[in-house]
């Protein structure tokens, strides 16, 4: 008698489980916490730049030091996003709505797929929402499942939420495609005009690739659940009570007009309405354009309108303030790394090398892989495009490659390695309370499988 046939899906599941186990063990053993990793990356960037460019050690240190403060406006924006999003999730009816949404998936497998899809969809709307709301949803689902007595693996929920971010640069807030569609952008002369979003973000090949990529990572996330014995549930206590139930800093209640103002709803509501008027006017004038500033002011207006008083809002912000500390500590390190790579010309050197080895059909794919490599050192879509774009657009002009494919190839590479980057994952770690190695071990699996639809989409668009 012949050997019994093993179903193909069983073989695939066994392979994924073994691969996941190996990756988790590797990350657990070799992946330090993000601040330590940032120091290691800094030293590595210094050594690489010193070895591969004419810059001497003094030049490298100066480039690093000059870069440290380059992201301060961005750091402030991200900190405010974290602060407002955290507060918004704990004010008024929002916790109940989040809980209702978190109750949609009924099984652990459905939860892993749901949070991946949710994070991917909000990432397509605006990239700041991907890691913030994705992390909040992962946490809320974990709490919901614990209340219902259903075991769910919290690290996988976090990794799945982060993996949904793999499509952000294909969406509405994609830096590179929006820049080349904007009048007066630095690449306009090189492109011979503007490149409309109908040829990049809204192109058929990009829309199809979005669907295939999200479907791939969602399906794979649903297969990665560990055995019952290995499940790690969320450990934190329930903290979704309104801020008014949290012990107040002032144990002695003040009297008079000061107390009335601090506890008056009309005060925060008035400012919230004024701010919301500005937000509506902004969208009316500029259309549905999302950036960090308008996202922050929209969140802040919502917080003001939902808060019962300035006292309640202050208490919630005080709780949220602890979540901002890791961002303030770690982001300057990556700003320094960007300074090294940009100010010494090392990134332009890398981009130029990759651009020279391409052919008409292969150049978009090379842009994709080189974009992934460069993003590890410059995790900023706009900055990366500014450095990498000129070399690849020049090569595309010579080879006759469609510039839209170059733009999206670099965008795909940027978002591809974002989901394994300790810098990018910080907001999600803050929202979930999970350690980096547990989240990145799962998102690394998604990084591997996302290669197929992302690269495949570019290949299909190049040849067909």
Model regions: which residues?
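Hydrophobic transmembrane alpha-helices of multi-pass small-molecule transporters
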Residues: 1-83, 202-212, 219-330, 446-451, ...
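Flexible loop linkers connecting adjacent transmembrane helices
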Residues: 19-23, 59-64, 89-105, 140-151, ...
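Membrane-interfacial loop-to-helix junctions in multi-pass transporters
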Residues: 31-33, 68-75, 103-114, 147-156, ...
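Membrane-interface helix termini and inter-helical loops of multi-pass transporters
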Residues: 54-66, 188-196, 285-289, 343-356
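Juxtamembrane transmembrane-helix boundary signature
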Residues: 75-96, 122, 129
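Hydrophobic alpha-helical transmembrane segments of multi-pass integral membrane proteins
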Residues: 104-137, 329-344, 355-394, 398-399, ...
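Alpha-helical transmembrane segments of multi-pass membrane proteins
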Residues: 108-123, 148-173, 192-198, 361-375, ...
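Membrane-core helix-loop-helix motifs of multi-pass transport proteins
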Residues: 138-232, 424-457
């Amino acid at each position: 008698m012949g050997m019994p046939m093993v179903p193909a899906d069983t073989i695939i599941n066994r392979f994924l489980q073994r691969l996941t186990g190996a990756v988790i063990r590797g990350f657990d053993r070799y992946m330090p916490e993000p601040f330590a990793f940032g120091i290691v990356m800094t030293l590595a960037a210094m050594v690489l730049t010193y070895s591969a460019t004419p810059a001497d050690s003094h030049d490298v240190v100066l480039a690093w030091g000059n870069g440290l403060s380059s992201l301060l406006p961005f750091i402030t924006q991200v900190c405010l996003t974290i602060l407002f999003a955290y507060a918004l999730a704990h004010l008024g009816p929002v916790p109940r709505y989040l809980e209702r949404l978190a109750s949609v998936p009924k099984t652990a497998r459905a939860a892993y797929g749901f949070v991946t899809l949710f994070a991917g969809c909000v990432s397509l709307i605006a990239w700041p929402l991907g890691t913030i709301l994705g992390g909040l949803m992962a946490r809320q689902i974990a709490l919901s499942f614990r209340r219902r007595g259903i075991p769910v693996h919290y690290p996988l929920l976090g990794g799945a939420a982060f993996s949904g971010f793999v499509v952000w640069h294909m969406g509405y807030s994609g830096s590179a495609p929006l820049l080349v569609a904007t009048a007066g952008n630095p690449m306009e002369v090189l492109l011979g005009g503007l490149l409309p979003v109908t040829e990049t973000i809204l192109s058929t090949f990009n829309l199809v690739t979005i669907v295939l990529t999200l479907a791939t990572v969602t399906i794979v996330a649903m297969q990665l659940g560990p055995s019952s014995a290995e499940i790690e549930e969320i450990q934190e206590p329930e903290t979704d009570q309104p801020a008014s139930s949290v012990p107040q800093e002032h144990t002695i209640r003040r009297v008079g007009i000061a107390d009335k103002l601090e506890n008056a709803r009309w005060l925060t509501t008035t400012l919230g309405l004024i701010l919301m008027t500005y937000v509506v006017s902004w969208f009316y004038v500029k259309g549905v354009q999302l950036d960090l500033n308008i996202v922050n002011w929209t969140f802040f207006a919502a917080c003001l309108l939902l808060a019962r008083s300035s006292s309640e809002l202050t208490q919630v912000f005080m709780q949220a303030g602890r979540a901002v500390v890791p961002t303030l500590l770690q982001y300057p390190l990556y700003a320094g790394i960007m300074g090294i790579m940009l100010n010494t010309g090392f990134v332009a050197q890398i981009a130029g090398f990759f651009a020279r080895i391409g052919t008409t059909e292969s150049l978009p794919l090379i842009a994709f892989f080189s974009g992934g490599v460069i993003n590890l050192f410059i995790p900023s879509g706009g900055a990366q495009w500014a450095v990498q774009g000129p070399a690849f657009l020049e090569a595309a002009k010579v080879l006759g490659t469609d510039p839209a494919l170059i733009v999206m190839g670099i965008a795909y590479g940027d978002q591809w390695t974002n989901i394994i980057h300790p810098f990018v994952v910080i907001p999600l770690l803050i929202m979930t309370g999970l350690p980096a190695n547990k989240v990145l071990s799962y998102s690394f699996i998604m990084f591997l499988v996302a290669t197929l639809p992302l690269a495949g989409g570019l290949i299909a668009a190049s040849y067909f």
